[in-house]
Amino acid sequence: MNTIPTRCLLGGLLALSLLAYAGEGDGTQHIVIDSGDTARSWEAARQSQEQWNATHGLRNKVNTRVEKDFDRYDQAVDLQEKCNSSQNVNAYWEPNTSRCLDRRTGRSLLAP
């Protein structure tokens, strides 16, 4: 006796639930395919390249300066050893100026 209204009620509920489910997803599902060639990505890549170039240039300057300082120090050590082992009795090493000087005249000795 109650089977027909129950079946109609269940069928109606099923139809309503399917309509409600189908209506929810209509406006929210979007598929965006981007090749990465947008203006924003080009600008970000350009800025990244500029920053890399700037840091690379600064690193090169720092490395060049360090090499020059090392070469100066290395040359000063060589001159000091040469001055201290010199046969000239009047030759002495001046550490403040990193030069080999003559005790009598105070002049720089080119070849100690």
Swiss-Prot record:
<dbReference type="Pfam" id="PF06932">
    <property type="entry name" value="DUF1283"/>
</dbReference>
<keyword id="KW-0732">Signal</keyword>
<protein>
    <recommendedName>
        <fullName>UPF0482 protein SG1468</fullName>
    </recommendedName>
</protein>
<feature type="signal peptide">
    <location>
        <begin position="1"/>
        <end position="22"/>
    </location>
</feature>
<dbReference type="InterPro" id="IPR009700">
    <property type="entry name" value="DUF1283"/>
</dbReference>
<comment type="similarity">
    <text>Belongs to the UPF0482 family.</text>
</comment>
